[in-house]
Amino acid sequence: MPLVRRSVAAASSLIEAGSLTDHLVDQFVHRMGYHPSKSEVKSWDMSIRVLVGDLQDAGLESVEMLLEYRLPLNSKRADVVLCGVHPRTGEESYVVVELKQWNTAIPVDGTDDVIFSESFNQPRLHPVEQVRAYCEYIADMVGMLDGEGEKLAGAAYLHNAVDEAVAGLFLMEPSQHGQLFTSSRRQEFLKFLRSRLDQKPGADAADALLNSAIKPSTQLLAVAADEVQRREQFTLLDEQQVAYSIVMRAVNRAYGANTKQVVVITGGPGSGKSVIALSLMGELARRGRTVMHATGSSALGLMHE
């Protein structure tokens, strides 16, 4: 879910009234229970203003903006997800945009995807790799996409930087899910946006994304099942196999009766709770069921739908 959802035109009106950033802060406090950092608030105030202006210049005022979109079942947030209609196919089209205020940045020696800048005091993930991963994660976890990334595109927009100041970042190969733009390439950025989004209203596309079931894609489940089932070290012993069988029985009964059951497996450190959960995950995924596991700092639980 985003902190704020508005059309480009509506977001522009809030910016002119000086209230968009305040609205983002209010929603952040309401959702998270604490105040965002000063740097984050400054980023909202400056970067979103630039993006909205670019979208207006591209003639995309009816596109829907999801500001600070939280990734499904994850604490990470994409800066902006633009929702609209693809100008060629007429289907839903989404553009994930990561906004950076950096003036300079260079690759870290010996790495392909780590960068450093005077704007921050520690290494960061290359913004193209960041937005690419966000696109792939969304495709894998949003049911309406089911692992198909064709409706998604990604862009890292360094709107304060010129090409010369971040030249090393262009060494990373661009793709549909990850492209790099700077202030020097603003016209290319507008062309990119128009290639992915039509002038038609994007409200329906936003509704489709936000109302979609959250579940791992068929492709992701197949990979998980294959990976887990191939690991010979997941041999269940004694009570572990008993617990596994009890859970499978509960799943089968719940599935047949269209009900829900909760099975709690207890045990100390090293007793095999995680092994049981991963074995269940692999077997259920292999059977074509929607299955997810969520981990805490000291335990791993299994969620099955």
Sequence positions of predicted segments:
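Conserved RecA-like ASCE P-loop NTPase motor core of nucleic-acid helicases/translocases
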Residues: Q261-G301
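Accessory nucleic-acid engagement/destabilization modules that flank
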Residues: M1-A208
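Glycine- and acidic
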Residues: D113-Q122, A225-Q233, Q261-T266
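N-terminal pre-P-loop "Q-motif" helix
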Residues: S217, E232-Q261
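Short, well-ordered alpha-helices that flank and scaffold nucleotide-derived cofactor binding pockets
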Residues: E136, R249-N252, G282-R286
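P-loop NTPase switch/communication element
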Residues: M303-E305
